[in-house]
């Protein structure tokens, strides 16, 4: 869900009165006002409640989420319907409530509770400015931010209690959220603020009488509400899910590994949110989900907190218990709800926030519950008796000590009329008595947790600057405290605070770039492809031979020390040893080998979704061109690209393959995968030209990305700054970046389809028993399949990483454009139709209207014309051969359906955004190029034959020449 921006953040919209007036619209009982936020497919507006039939305005605010239904595919529409259905059934103080819903033919207007303070992510980022705003000024005065880290622990515990209260309610209904993150945790000023500031009439419109009354926590602090249930679903306790949903930085490892998961995945997200509130950064940060999972695995459950941070032992223990990689070792829901941080009183509260029972002089707790002192609106004085959540005798305790609410009992008859009771409850089946309040009284004597010098975090690799001092420090266990004198404590605390502050400033920029912007579905596809490639690799004959040779090799001790040289006398390693080393070069994902779940093609993956989104701009006519700028497409340095790199066993059938027929389904399938890989390679080469204009690399890194020994080089992900763009204007960078991005996405679409074909074949044939003769043929096919799938997997991951880099470049360049430029972010609107929205992760807008098909079509025309001219003049015929084949491959890629479907589509259906007329035009051009290409190859064969004849007819005394060109289609 797109969340409203906080009041102390600069607004990107509604800058002028005219634009505000244009935004006003009557939607049922509400008037839509100014624009406050934007999502991938929705705009969020602030609305006000109006009296029916009178148009008299009230000052109570609501949030109106206006979803453009025309931009949603079936999957997203299902998510929207699911979100509305879930919100209708959920009524809890710490869950954003649905107030109303209005549907039009083109838009769905969802009226929800308005959260004035925005989301928790902005709250943490702008924590230094909270003291300057009326809604949070008193909070910061009472609980100032620490010098190192994020929010005061009192505030963190307050939010943790409220988050636990909402989760306990969700678990009682068997719901799992699946996308808990700071951006989906919205905040409202406390009711105490509205009461004391005399602005009760400005309180947001409440869905029911208790939605603005906190169920737990501190009454004077902001109120937290969980939002965005687009990925939520009903998941019974014994069920497991396997859909990759959520935001990578806050995803549980089992989801990143594409394993089945249960509701415990939400607990991991809770741990990441608590860590970020305490430390002002997520516990794990990475550019993509593969790197993120690697960092989580490498940490091995050792959660390290920044030095100098003020964090109690109980809070650290809770976060560490939540951030366990294995769900079986992770804290359970019952343990979480009964944890001291959630169940017990919040320590170090100021006197005015203490429950009234704690301030009473009598040692015994009062019999009657304390009554609220502030006055609430009249419509909130009466609470419906059929509230979906209930109260219990535990409501009589103070708010700071109240545990979260579970499904509840009926209101007590002793409840005072007109006084909204606390929405707190006892746990089901719990017979434990309520602890006397006086047992918590000693906690008030200690105003701040003592910061000791004990090493509370697991051991980590220290920088070189710290290793020199390591010998003088004693490491203590988590349960011990270092006996440091008080004077040394102060010095050490100052040193840690200063060092932590420097690190805080250095990490802030990295955090902004690494913070997740939304839902990244492409990560799911990468996990699926990695899992399939690993599974096929395990089942290939080569890998099985490696295992046998490894067992044989382990029976004897290897004495090989190195390569044979004249000086060392080392013997060359045996063939068996060489074989067993090969898998380590390309297949290191041991965790994926253990899974044998069927591969499921995902047609709604990011590859397909991104391509469909970008191809919303019509390609009809094909005569339109992007703005012509110096140095942009097509670059003069672009030449034809070689075919998909095959092994020595000739993975591809190069040349005229019309005469090649086969009745073997396996061979046909592998041939289809190889053809798709070849098409993707051609488009990838085109994208690489654009990429290297924006991110130059050393000459040694060019080519096929293959290093010494056949090891594939990892694409550079560090070059994301603007140092290499100094010679390009922002306008030029925007154009090149958009062209590169759409070409990479087109490449991903073809790679995606090739993996779908491989997955369908693998699921169908992997379990069958074969005769010895058939098994021998299958082994050869499996070898080819393993090689091509491994290549596709590596290329898919590389394109994902590079497309992320280009996306960042594009967003940076758009920010650097003049403010009056049409492509500047403040002049763009996803709903206006003037720009194309790409994906749902970063709200990338393509302003030039370019598509991959348009670029490929223009380039194919240019290359075929160049080849035709050279053919007529007889100049450089091998180069003409490459140009013709590359142009034909580009046109074939345009016509290739990106989805692997068992049913044949109608001729009138659009495929990849192309209408029938456009496809027919491209098909005619392709046939003409193929015809000329066939004629050219005949000319080349004639030249070769003439050259051979001239060699054989040469005098015997002259040496023969063997300088003929290499085989067809070879790149020069």
From Swiss-Prot:
GO MF assignments: ATP binding; protein serine kinase activity; protein serine/threonine kinase activity
UniProt KW keywords: ATP-binding, Autophagy, Cytoplasm, Kinase, Membrane, Nucleotide-binding, Protein transport, Serine/threonine-protein kinase, Transferase, Transport
Annotated region (Disordered), positions in chain: 1-20, 358-510, 538-602, 706-725, 812-835, 938-972
Catalysed reactions, semicolon-separated: L-seryl-[protein] + ATP = O-phospho-L-seryl-[protein] + ADP + H(+); L-threonyl-[protein] + ATP = O-phospho-L-threonyl-[protein] + ADP + H(+)
Recorded topology in the membrane: Peripheral membrane protein
Pfam families: ATG1-like_MIT1, ATG1-like_MIT2, Pkinase
Active site, UniProt feature: 179
Basic and acidic residues bias (residue ranges): 437-448, 489-498, 544-555
GO biological process, one term: mitophagy
Top-rank taxon, per record: Eukaryota
Protein name, UniProt field: Serine/threonine-protein kinase atg1
């Amino acid at each position: 869900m797109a969340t409203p921006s906080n009041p102390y953040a600069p607004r990107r919209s509604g800058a002028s009165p005219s634009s505000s007036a244009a935004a006003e619209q009557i939607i049922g009982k509400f008037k839509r006002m100014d624009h406050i936020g934007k999502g991938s497919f929705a705009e969020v507006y602030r609305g006000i409640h109006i009296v029916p039939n009178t148009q008299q305005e009230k000052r109570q605010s609501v949030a109106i989420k206006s979803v453009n239904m025309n931009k949603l595919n079936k999957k997203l529409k299902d998510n929207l319907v699911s979100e509305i259905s879930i919100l209708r059934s959920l009524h809890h103080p710490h869950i954003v409530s649905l107030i109303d819903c209005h549907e039009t033919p083109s838009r769905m207007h969802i009226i929800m509770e308005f959260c004035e303070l925005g989301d928790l992510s902005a709250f943490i980022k702008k924590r230094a400015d909270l003291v300057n705003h009326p809604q949070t000024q008193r909070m910061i005065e009472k609980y100032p931010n620490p010098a190192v880290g994020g929010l005061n622990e009192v505030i963190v515990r307050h939010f943790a209690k409220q988050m636990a209260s909402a989760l306990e309610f969700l678990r009682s209904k068997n719901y799992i959220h699946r996308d808990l993150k700071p951006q989906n945790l919205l905040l409202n000023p406390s009711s105490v603020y509205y009461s004391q500031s005399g602005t009760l009439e400005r309180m947001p419109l409440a869905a029911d009488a208790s939605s603005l009354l906190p169920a737990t926590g501190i009454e004077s602090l902001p109120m937290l509400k969980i939002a965005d249930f687009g990925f939520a679903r009903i998941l019974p306790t014994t069920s497991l899910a396997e859909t990759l949903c959520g935001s990578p930085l806050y995803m549980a490892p089992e989801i990143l590994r594409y394993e089945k998961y249960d509701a415990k995945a939400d607990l991991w997200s809770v741990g990441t949110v608590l860590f970020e509130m305490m430390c002002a950064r997520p516990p794990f940060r990475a550019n993509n989900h593969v790197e993120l999972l690697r960092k989580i695995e490498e940490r091995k459950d050792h959660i390290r907190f920044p030095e100098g941070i003020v964090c109690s032992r109980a809070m650290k223990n809770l976060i560490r218990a939540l951030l366990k990689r294995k769900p079986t070792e992770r804290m359970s829901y019952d343990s979480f709800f009964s944890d001291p941080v959630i169940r017990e009183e919040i320590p170090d509260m100021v006197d005015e926030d203490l429950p009234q029972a704690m301030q009473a002089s009598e040692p015994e707790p009062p019999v009657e519950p304390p009554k609220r002192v502030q006055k609430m609106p009249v419509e909130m004085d009466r609470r419906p008796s059929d509230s979906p959540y209930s109260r219990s005798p535990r409501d009589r305790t103070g708010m700071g000590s109240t545990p979260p609410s579970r499904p509840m009992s009926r209101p007590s008859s002793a409840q005072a009329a007109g006084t909204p009771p606390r929405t707190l409850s006892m746990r089901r089946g719990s017979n434990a008595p309520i602890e006397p309040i006086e047992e918590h009284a000693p906690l008030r004597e200690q105003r701040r947790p003592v910061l000791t010098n004990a090493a509370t975090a697991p051991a980590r690799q220290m920088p070189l600057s710290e290793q020199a001092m390591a010998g003088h420090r004693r490491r203590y266990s988590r349960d011990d405290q270092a006996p440091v004198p008080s004077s040394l404590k102060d010095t050490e605390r100052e040193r840690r605070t200063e060092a932590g502050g420097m690190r805080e400033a250095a990490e802030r920029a990295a955090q902004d770039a690494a913070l997740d912007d939304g839902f990244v579905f492409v990560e799911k596809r990468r996990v699926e492809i990695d899992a399939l490639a690993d599974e096929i690799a395990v089942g290939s004959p080569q890998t099985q031979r490696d295992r046998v040779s490894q067992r044989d090799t382990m029976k004897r001790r290897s004495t090989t020390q190195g390569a044979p040289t004249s000086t060392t006398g080392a013997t060359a390693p045996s063939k068996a040893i060489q074989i067993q080393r090969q898998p380590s070069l390309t297949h290191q994902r041991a965790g994926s080998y253990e899974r044998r779940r069927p591969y499921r093609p995902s047609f709604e993956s990011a590859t397909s979704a991104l391509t469909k989104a970008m191809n919303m701009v019509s390609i009809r006519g094909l005569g339109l061109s992007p703005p012509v700028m110096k140095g942009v497409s097509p670059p003069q340095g672009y030449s034809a690209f070689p075919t998909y790199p095959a092994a020595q066993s000739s993975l591809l059938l190069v040349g005229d393959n019309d005469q090649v027929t086969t009745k073997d389904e396996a061979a046909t399938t592998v041939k289809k995968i190889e053809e798709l890989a070849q098409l993707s390679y051609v488009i990838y080469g085109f994208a690489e030209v654009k990429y290297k204009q924006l991110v130059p690399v050393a000459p040694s890194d060019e080519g096929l990305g293959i290093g010494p020994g056949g090891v594939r080089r990892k694409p550079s992900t560090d070059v994301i700054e603007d140092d290499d763009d100094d010679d390009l204007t922002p306008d030029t960078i925007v154009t090149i970046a958009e062209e590169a991005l759409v070409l990479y996405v087109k490449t991903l679409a073809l790679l995606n389809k090739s993996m779908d074909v491989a997955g369908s074949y693998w699921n169908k044939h992997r379990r069958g028993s074969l005769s010895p003769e058939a098994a021998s043929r299958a082994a050869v096919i499996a070898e080819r399949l393993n090689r091509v799938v491994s290549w596709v997997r590596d290329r898919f991951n590389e394109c994902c990483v590079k497309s992320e880099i280009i996306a960042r470049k594009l967003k940076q360049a758009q920010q650097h454009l003049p403010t009056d430029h049409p492509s500047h972010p403040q002049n763009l609107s996803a709903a206006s139709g003037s720009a194309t929205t790409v994906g749902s992760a970063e709200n990338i807008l393509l302003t030039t209207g370019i598509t991959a098909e348009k670029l490929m079509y223009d380039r194919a025309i240019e290359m075929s014309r160049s080849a035709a001219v050279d053919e007529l003049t007889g100049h450089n015929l091998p180069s003409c051969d490459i140009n013709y084949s590359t142009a034909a491959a580009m046109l074939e890629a345009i016509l290739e359906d990106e989805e692997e479907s068992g049913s044949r589509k109608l001729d009138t259906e659009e495929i990849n955004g192309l209408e029938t007329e456009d496809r027919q035009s491209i098909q005619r051009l392709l046939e003409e190029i193929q015809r000329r290409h066939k004629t050219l190859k005949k000319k080349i064969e004639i030249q070769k034959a003439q050259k051979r004849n001239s060699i054989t007819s040469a005098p015997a005394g002259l040496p023969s020449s063997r300088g003929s060109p290499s085989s067809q289609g070879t790149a020069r």
